[in-house]
């Protein structure tokens, strides 16, 4: 246990100050619980921003990691190794649509690869540069690289990075007429969206919206790109969120829970685009390394299991019921939205802008949560969350909300 004098927090000034973490130094985790360097225990309903889909220190992931660590960590992509080859096959099979996979290190990299693939495909079709537009949606979040942050239709993430790359067009999420208008000029090469917007407030696509987007893409010979980096890998109750809408994409991007906490990303390419990128068209030094791929293979197998799907359904219902009960008592929420274990509690107008304050109180009561903007509490726990862990989390949340109401 560290003291204030020797706390790692004294080293925080060496960080580029692009984050605003809470003043807690987490040291270890088990399941949906973590402990800080003072020995204090927290119930984690954030799972590292939807990354630790199997909780902390999952024994099967640990076994895969340690076994592979004793064999081979890295080769680069000028040589083959078995784990990424097997992972690619398993992702193609699991996806029900893909023919090829590009493995990388993060969600941003997966989306960057998808953007490049769209442009390369449009070029291969003989389309001039001004007819390779990618439509994205306001409230989206697709990453932090220059192209992916341009795809992210939120000015707060783009400010100061101008000039941004051209060839992107923004429309309101779930607005079919606006999308029809945006595609009418015939210059759109792809539509890119999250089936559930995460950073944009846990906002699901409206029923039938994805199907309409798919139809418009077919009508205009444009690609459908689905960013499932946060909502994929079992989080909504099915391995891929778009399965519930019965649409077939051309490209899907994955990361976060795919590695169960170990960094990895993937871009899945369907038959229309699978052969577009050939030798030298794209690449990565670390992407698909044997260590990450070995862990991801086990994470994929477990996240695709019926047991996870059943648990997500049960805990989602219990979490919704618990949040509704808290709202009946305190009246702080206007709406509970989302799907599976990706839920957002939207604050009532009287409490607008107070998500951060509630999160601070939650942490003080031993509960780790996220926000999705200033008005939404975001719940993205581990998908193997137990009944007891959820009950404990809701009890701690009640104490936090009671303290918040007492202060306001």
From Swiss-Prot:
Its cofactor is pyridoxal 5'-phosphate. GO terms for molecular function: identical protein binding; N2-acetyl-L-ornithine:2-oxoglutarate 5-aminotransferase activity; pyridoxal phosphate binding. GO terms for biological process: L-arginine biosynthetic process. Pyridoxal 5'-phosphate binds at residues 107-108, 141, 227-230, 285. CDD domains: OAT_like. Its EC number is 2.6.1.11. The keyword Protease does not apply. Pfam families: Aminotran_3 (PF00202). The modification N6-(pyridoxal phosphate)lysine is found at residue 256. Its main location: cytoplasm. Keywords: Amino-acid biosynthesis, Aminotransferase, Arginine biosynthesis, Cytoplasm, Pyridoxal phosphate, Transferase. Binds 1 pyridoxal phosphate per subunit. It is an enzyme of class 2 (transferase). The keyword Ribonucleoprotein does not apply. It is found in: Cytoplasm. It catalyses: N(2)-acetyl-L-ornithine + 2-oxoglutarate = N-acetyl-L-glutamate 5-semialdehyde + L-glutamate. GO terms for cellular component: cytoplasm. Pathway: Amino-acid biosynthesis; L-arginine biosynthesis; N(2)-acetyl-L-ornithine from L-glutamate: step 4/4. N(2)-acetyl-L-ornithine binds at residues 144, 284. Belongs to the class-III pyridoxal-phosphate-dependent aminotransferase family. ArgD subfamily. HAMAP family: ArgD_aminotrans_3. Homodimer. May also have succinyldiaminopimelate aminotransferase activity, thus carrying out the corresponding step in lysine biosynthesis. This is Acetylornithine aminotransferase. It comes from Xanthomonas campestris pv. campestris (strain ATCC 33913 / DSM 3586 / NCPPB 528 / LMG 568 / P 25). The lineage of its organism: Bacteria, Pseudomonadati, Pseudomonadota, Gammaproteobacteria, Lysobacterales.
């Amino acid at each position: 246990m560290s003291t204030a004098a020797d706390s790692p927090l004294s080293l925080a000034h060496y960080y580029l100050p692009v984050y605003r973490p809470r003043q807690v130094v987490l040291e270890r985790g088990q399941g949906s619980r973590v402990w800080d360097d003072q020995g204090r225990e927290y119930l984690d309903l954030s799972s590292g921003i939807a990354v630790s889909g199997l909780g902390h220190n999952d024994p099967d992931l640990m076994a895969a990691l340690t076994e592979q660590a004793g064999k081979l960590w890295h080769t680069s992509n000028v040589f083959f190794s078995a784990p990424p080859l097997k992972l690619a096959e398993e992702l193609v099979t699991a996806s029900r649509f893909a023919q090829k996979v590009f493995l990388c290190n993060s969600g941003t990299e997966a989306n960057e690869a998808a953007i490049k693939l769209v442009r390369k495909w449009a070029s291969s079709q003989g389309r001039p540069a001004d007819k390779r537009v990618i439509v994205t949606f306001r409230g989206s979040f697709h990453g932090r690289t220059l192209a992916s942050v341009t795809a992210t239709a939120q000015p707060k993430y783009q400010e100061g990075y101008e000039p941004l790359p051209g060839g992107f067009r923004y429309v309101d999420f779930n607005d079919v007429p606006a999308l029809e208008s945006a595609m009418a000029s015939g210059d759109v090469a792809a539509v890119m969206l999250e089936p559930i917007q995460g950073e944009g407030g846990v906002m699901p696509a409206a029923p039938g919206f994805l199907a309409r987007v798919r139809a418009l893409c077919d009508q205009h010979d444009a690609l459908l790109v689905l960013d499932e980096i946060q909502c994929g890998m079992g989080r909504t109750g099915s391995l891929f969120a778009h399965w519930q809408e019965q649409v077939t994409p051309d490209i899907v991007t994955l990361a976060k829970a795919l590695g169960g906490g170990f960094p990895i990303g993937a871009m899945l390419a369907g038959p229309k685009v699978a052969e577009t990128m050939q030798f030298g068209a794209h690449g990565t030094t670390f992407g698909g390394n044997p260590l990450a791929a070995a862990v991801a293979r086990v994470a994929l197998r477990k996240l695709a299991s019926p047991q996870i799907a059943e648990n997500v359904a049960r805990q989602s219902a219990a979490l919704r019921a618990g949040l509704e009960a808290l709202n009946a008592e305190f009246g702080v929420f206007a709406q509970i939205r989302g799907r599976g274990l990706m839920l957002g509690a939207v604050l009532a107008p009287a409490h607008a802008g107070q998500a951060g304050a509630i999160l601070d109180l939650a942490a003080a009561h031993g509960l780790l949560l996220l926000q999705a903007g200033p008005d939404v509490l975001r719940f993205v726990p581990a998908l193997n969350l137990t009944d007891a862990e959820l009950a404990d989390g809701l009890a701690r949340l009640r104490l936090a909300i009671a303290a918040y109401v007492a202060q306001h």
